[in-house]
UniProtKB/Swiss-Prot annotation:
Residues 37-49, 152-168, 176-185, 214-227 have a biased composition (Basic and acidic residues). The gene is wac. Residues 101-121, 230-260, 299-331, 467-486 have a biased composition (Low complexity). GO terms for molecular function: chromatin binding; RNA polymerase II complex binding. Residues 123-156 form the WW domain. PANTHER family: WW DOMAIN-CONTAINING ADAPTER PROTEIN WITH COILED-COIL (PTHR15911:SF6). SUPFAM superfamilies: WW domain (SSF51045). Residues 74-84 have a biased composition (Basic residues). InterPro entries: WAC, WW_dom, WW_dom_sf. GO terms for biological process: chromatin remodeling; DNA damage response; mitotic G1 DNA damage checkpoint signaling; positive regulation of DNA-templated transcription. Residues 1-130, 152-338, 417-532 are annotated as: Disordered. It comes from the Eukaryota. This is WW domain-containing adapter protein with coiled-coil. It comes from Xenopus tropicalis.
Length: 628
């Protein structure tokens, strides 16, 4: 009789013995060949919760059953649904069907010139193929309709990839073909010129509204250029840049020059073509810059450099169509004088600010005005934003991004010892208020430079703003202030002398009115619906450090986010590989332990067997000795 040693229970090391899925097996073998999410129904890879290894797949996990279970209907049924939907003329609405019909929707939605083939056909034959991994680890492709398997990639997929490449190539820089943008722009320019020659003082609100609405459906895209690539309009407006390097004292007689290589009459007709490289004409741009150009002109009469925004280099002011305010300033550019350093004059920057704010409100843009007010804190930030407005065309007029940059720049108030503006808006009243809170004239700011040769601007421009009352009242206020400024003969007033009176200022420019001239030109016509907010107060500005938040603003934040996601992916992959290595090592060690256990059991059994034999031999010895 042989006694067996009782086998001890093995130590559990936290890993289950059987069905132990390793992470590298559960990593998705996602198909790189077709991006549509329809291949999830054919996905033979089990997700990480399914414990069975991929080569021992149960029948219920096969792609067809999986899809029928999850979607609740078979493939034929869903294909039938797609056909019905497409016959009705609509694309599918439920997200599941959307994902299966991805290619059809893609081709119909992108504004491509290629006709949408996939939306007309009943289904895409490429959807029948799915990609799988064989037990040997190689990829193979399976057609669920014909039940054919093959090693090489099916030709339907290759055709679909080719189609998608073409559509994406065309969709990058394409417009609907049914609109002739160049002809529209030329007609608009011609109409505006006729209108101006006949009636220079006022402009009918209907014309303005139709003009604005004509631009509103342009999708806020760049105007098409026939001779330049899509990147050209972005880089080339820099040629029309104002040179801030010149000294502020050398303000020349004329605000802007006609660039000799573009004759003015040619310019307006060339608007969407090659001349766009110099500066985009207002007719082809989005509404925001147009009104920007105009209102700036109306709000800073005092220093006649301001047709900077309204008269483009190479365009007389009379050729620029006013969109939201129809004041016309007869400024004639002198041909060969150099471009003035507009952006060096802080007074001018202060005066350009209200125009920007009024423009944003007139266009009903929901931009937070307080961010611009923060930007007004420093001269450098104002310079940068206005430099962008003056030099860049519609490409730079993604207003929200512009203002986020302004908010960043406003943080430089901590370094400058100038007291920042605190602009408060009374949300209940539509009029613009000016309140005397900070009336400390600073000595370190550049005083108002008298511009000696001012072009004759005698008539007060009429304001016909159809959009909103606030804008027009604020503009008349700023015009009165600039008129008073002119009558006083450009006395040097500090731009930081921001006097505000919490009651409405008297419309008659009296003798004491000059103290609040600069204030009114800088006061922002706040929209009544804009929520009341104020910029950094001087005490807070002392504690504000731009460097601490610079990394979470604007493009550095996007860059950091991309880096973080890339690092996260890498860490995940590395972790998976490391985990799989550790798992295999652990299994190896566990098998060694198992071998040792088996050897120990064998030894124990051998010892027991030998003891048994010893006992039997002793018995036999005793019997022998007894018999002897």
């Amino acid at each position: 009789m042989v006694m067996y040693a009782r086998k001890q229970a093995r130590l559990s090391d936290g890993c289950h013995d059987r069905r132990d899925s390793q992470p590298y097996q559960t990593l998705k073998y996602s198909s790189k060949s077709h991006p549509s999410s329809s291949d999830h129904r054919h996905d033979k890879m089990r997700d990480s919760t399914d414990p069975s290894p991929p080569n021992k797949m149960r029948r219920s996990n096969s792609p067809e059953n999986k899809y029928i279970d999850s979607a609740g209907h078979g493939k034929a049924k869903s294909m039938h649904l797609h056909r019905v939907r497409e016959r009705d003329g609509g694309t599918s609405f439920s997200p599941q069907e959307n994902s299966h019909n991805h290619s059809a929707i893609h081709s119909s939605n992108s504004h491509s010139s290629t006709p949408s083939k996939t939306s007309d056909s009943a289904y895409d034959p490429a959807d029948d193929w799915s990609e799988h991994i064989s037990s040997s680890g190689k990829k193979y492709y399976y057609n669920c309709r014909t039940e054919v398997s093959q090693w090489e990639k099916p030709k339907e997929w290759l055709e679909r990839e080719q189609r998608q490449k073409e559509t994406s190539k065309v969709a990058v820089n394409s417009f609907p073909k049914d609109r002739d943008y160049r002809r529209e722009a030329m007609q608009a320019a011609a109409a505006v010129e006729e209108k101006h020659s006949s009636d220079t003082s006022t402009m009918l609100p209907q014309n303005i509204l139709s003009q604005t609405s004509r631009h509103n459906d342009r999708d806020y895209r760049l105007p098409r250029t026939d001779s330049h690539s899509s990147a050209a309009p972005v880089q080339q407006p820099v040629k029309a840049a104002v040179h801030p390097a010149a000294a502020p004292s050398t303000v020349p007689s004329s605000p802007f020059t006609v660039q000799p290589d573009h004759p003015p009459p040619k310019k307006s007709y060339d608007a969407n073509g090659a001349a766009l490289s110099k500066l985009p004409t207002p007719t082809s741009s989005i509404p925001v810059p147009k009104s920007e150009r105009k209102e700036t002109a109306s709000s800073d009469k005092s220093s006649c450099t301001t047709p900077s925004t309204s008269s483009a280099p190479g365009l007389n002011l009379s050729a620029a169509p006013p969109s939201s305010s129809s004041s016309t300033v007869p400024v004639s550019p002198v041909p060969q004088s150099p471009i003035p350093p507009i952006l060096q004059d802080p007074n001018l920057l202060r005066q350009l600010l209200p125009a920007l704010q009024a423009t944003l409100q007139l266009n009903n843009s929901n931009v937070d005005i307080s961010k611009i007010n923060e930007a007004a804190v420093t001269q450098a930030s104002l310079q940068s934003i206005l430099h962008k407005i003056l030099t860049a065309g519609p490409s730079a007029f993604n207003i929200t991004s512009l203002i986020s940059q302004v908010a960043q720049l406003s943080a430089q108030a901590a370094q400058s010892n100038q007291s920042p503006m605190s602009l408060t808006s009374d949300a209940s009243s539509p009029r613009s208020y000016v309140s005397p809170r900070i009336s400390t004239p600073q000595t370190n700011t550049v005083p108002h430079k008298p511009l000696l040769s001012t072009p004759p601007v005698t008539s007060q421009p009429k304001v016909g703003t159809p959009g909103s009352k606030q804008g027009s009242s604020a503009q008349t206020a700023s015009q009165q202030s600039s008129a008073a400024d002119k009558s006083q003969g450009h006395e040097p007033t500090s731009p930081r002398n921001l006097q505000r009176s919490s009651s409405q200022r008297s419309p008659s420019p009296g003798p004491n009115h000059n103290s609040s001239t600069c204030a009114s030109s800088t006061s922002a016509p706040q929209n009544s619906s804009a929520r009341s907010s104020c910029s950094l107060t001087p005490t807070l500005a002392a504690y504000f450090n731009e460097n601490l938040v610079k990394h979470v603003q604007g493009w550095p934040a996007d860059h950091a986010e991309k880096q973080a996601s890339r690092l996260r992916e890498e860490a995940h992959n590395m972790g998976s590989i490391h985990m799989s290595e550790v798992c295999t090592e652990l299994k190896n060690l566990r098998s060694l332990v198992r071998v040792c256990e088996i050897q120990a059991t064998l030894r124990e059994q051998r010892i027991l067997f030998l003891r048994q034999q010893i006992k039997e031999l002793e018995k036999l010895k005793n019997q022998n000795s007894f018999m002897v």
